[in-house]
């Protein structure tokens, strides 16, 4: 492909990745259809000019046979195919179950030998107030308990990442694997499984707190006693999955969430999540430090009830975000300690996409989260939340990628680090869809040709630095002080249909 660049405009370039199908390596650990994938990837590379792909590397597939019995064969074959085609790889360390969330068309559980532990001790799973277990990811309560053939949950994740590094060293060394996104919760996101469709949640329900397993219960009681309130228990008045905030004692106006007890609980609940991310990213940093690779973690775009005073859906997911308390900057500060990238979602959504009763505000949410990450000095990448094929969604993605547009004289003030398109399917290649998708990639690239040298657009990957300091409660409290967002233009200056 002949290339033609304007060097200053190239500094506005946002690389585009495409997420591979969930079952590209199937549950039997077989790369089942390399021919079809190769044909599709060639078209993405040669006709659309995409920069790379993102792929889930499922724990439930790799370590399915037993503790430390890792089998990377199918993934090595897949990655070698991708490398041969000249594409880069964003690899997700997927420690969660596939199945039970939006868009999950295949089922890949966590390893059977881990689930066997859960048969005898179901408290290893996140649990709601009624006692219903969520088996898609292990509870934070067992992060440091040696319940898994002598290993803790964090050791399971750490050993897996070490094995990945050893087995993929040549591809990391060659600059093919550029990002390691560390799964930190359900759907690979740093959150609690507060809105599981498998338990009957429907949009825009408030969701439920997921901290009623015996391990987290004990942790909370100890924290409450230490704070001088041994009588405090976990919330009993926070409602059920599909309630509205005003129907609950916890989230209603002047409800429990604004009381001393409610604030204590929310601080504990959200801090557990942030320290969970901090510990596992710390392990990932130890493993990958010194290698030319980026670390990343994904934060969920919980845009519904954002305009309700309680932000109930965010609170149940573990994001303690209110009009007068910043729930996202503390996460960004935690990531900054490990030189991590914040990966966000729902970039395609507009406030008008949902009914008024959802009190949904994805545009303001994206603006808030991206701004807070940039204020903490870290990079932000992102993806669309739902399948998107139209100009309206693409133009919104382009606006978020460069909120103040292209700078003809060099690097723009605000620019996302990368965009990952969800997801590769036959529908993408339908004629009109593919033509528009090609335009999206071209506009993301600031109307420049595909550029294989990331240094030319300011993305040279340097060896990952060692985590710089211990995250403290003071760090979180400081970052939680409210601060404004950057200004966004009303629309992108590079429309796909403009």
Swiss-Prot record:
Disruption phenotype: Almost complete loss of beta-amylase activity in rosette leaves and inflorescences (stems). Substrate binds at residues 56, 96, 104, 298, 303, 345, 384-385, 423. InterPro entries: Glyco_hydro_14, Glyco_hydro_14_CS, Glyco_hydro_14B_pln, Glycoside_hydrolase_SF. Keywords: Carbohydrate metabolism, Cytoplasm, Glycosidase, Hydrolase, Polysaccharide degradation. It is found in: Cytoplasm. One of its GO terms (biological process) is response to herbivore. Gene3D superfamilies: Glycosidases. Detected in phloem sieve elements. Induction: Circadian-regulated, with a peak in expression just before the light period in short day conditions. Its EC number is 3.2.1.2. The active site is at residues 189, 383. It is an enzyme of class 3 (hydrolase). One of its GO terms (molecular function) is beta-amylase activity. GO terms for cellular component: secretory vesicle. It catalyses: Hydrolysis of (1->4)-alpha-D-glucosidic linkages in polysaccharides so as to remove successive maltose units from the non-reducing ends of the chains. PROSITE patterns: BETA_AMYLASE_1, BETA_AMYLASE_2. SUPFAM superfamilies: (Trans)glycosidases. It comes from the Eukaryota. Its main location: cytoplasm. Belongs to the glycosyl hydrolase 14 family. Beta-amylase activity. Major cytosolic beta-amylase isoform in rosette leaves and inflorescences stems. This is Beta-amylase 5. It comes from Arabidopsis thaliana (Mouse-ear cress). The lineage of its organism: Eukaryota, Viridiplantae, Streptophyta, Embryophyta, Tracheophyta. The gene is BAM5.
């Amino acid at each position: 492909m002949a290339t033609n660049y304007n060097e200053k405009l190239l500094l506005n370039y946002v690389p585009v990745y495409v997420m591979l199908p969930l079952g590209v390596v199937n549950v039997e650990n077989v790369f089942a259809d390399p021919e079809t994938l190769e044909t599709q990837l060639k078209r993405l590379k040669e006709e659309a000019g995409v920069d790379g792909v993102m792929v889930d590397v499922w724990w439930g597939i790799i370590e399915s046979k037993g503790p430390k019995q890792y089998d990377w064969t199918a993934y090595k074959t897949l990655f070698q195919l991708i490398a041969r085609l000249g594409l880069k790889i964003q690899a997700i360390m997927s420690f969660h179950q596939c199945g039970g969330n939006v868009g999950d068309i295949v089922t890949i559980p966590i390893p059977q030998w881990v689930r066997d532990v859960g048969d005898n001790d179901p408290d290893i799973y996140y649990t709601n107030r009624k006692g219903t277990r969520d088996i898609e990811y292990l509870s934070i309560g067992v992060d440091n308990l040696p319940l898994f053939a002598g290993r803790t949950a964090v050791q399971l994740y750490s050993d897996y990442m070490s094995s990945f590094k050893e087995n993929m060293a040549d591809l990391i060394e060659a600059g093919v694997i550029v990002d390691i996104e560390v799964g930190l919760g359900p759907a690979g996101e740093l959150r609690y499984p507060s809105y599981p469709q498998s338990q009957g949640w429907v949009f825009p329900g408030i969701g439920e707190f997921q901290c009623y397993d015996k391990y987290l219960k004990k942790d909370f009681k100890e924290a409450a006693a230490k704070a001088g309130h041994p009588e405090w228990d976990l919330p009993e008045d926070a409602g059920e999955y599909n309630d509205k905030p005003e129907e609950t004692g916890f989230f209603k106006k002047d409800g429990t969430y604004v009381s001393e007890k409610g604030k204590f609980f929310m601080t504990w609940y959200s801090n557990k999540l942030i320290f969970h991310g901090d510990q596992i990213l710390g392990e990932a940093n130890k493993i990958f430090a010194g290698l030319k690779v980026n670390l990343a973690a994904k934060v969920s775009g919980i845009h519904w009830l954002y305009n309700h005073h309680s932000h109930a859906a965010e609170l149940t997911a573990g994001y303690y975000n209110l009009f007068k308390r910043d729930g996202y900057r503390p996460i960004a500060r935690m990531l900054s300690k490990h030189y991590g990238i914040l990966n966000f979602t729902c970039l395609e959504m507009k406030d008008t996409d949902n009914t008024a009763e959802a009190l949904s505000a994805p545009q303001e949410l994206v603006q808030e989260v991206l701004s807070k990450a940039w204020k903490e000095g870290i990079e932000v990448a992102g993806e669309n939340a739902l399948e998107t094929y139209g100009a309206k969604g693409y133009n919104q993605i382009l606006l978020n990628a460069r909120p103040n547009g292209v700078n003809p004289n060099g690097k723009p003030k605000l620019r996302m680090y990368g965009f990952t398109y969800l997801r590769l399917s036959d529908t993408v290649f339908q004629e009109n869809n593919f033509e528009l998708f090609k335009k999206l990639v071209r506009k993301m690239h600031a109307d420049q040709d595909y550029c294989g040298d990331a240094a030319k657009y300011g993305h040279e990957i340097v060896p990952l630095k060692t985590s710089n300091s211990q995250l403290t409660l003071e760090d979180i409290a400081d970052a939680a002080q409210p601060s404004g967002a950057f200004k966004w233009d009303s629309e992108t200056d590079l429309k796909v249909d403009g």
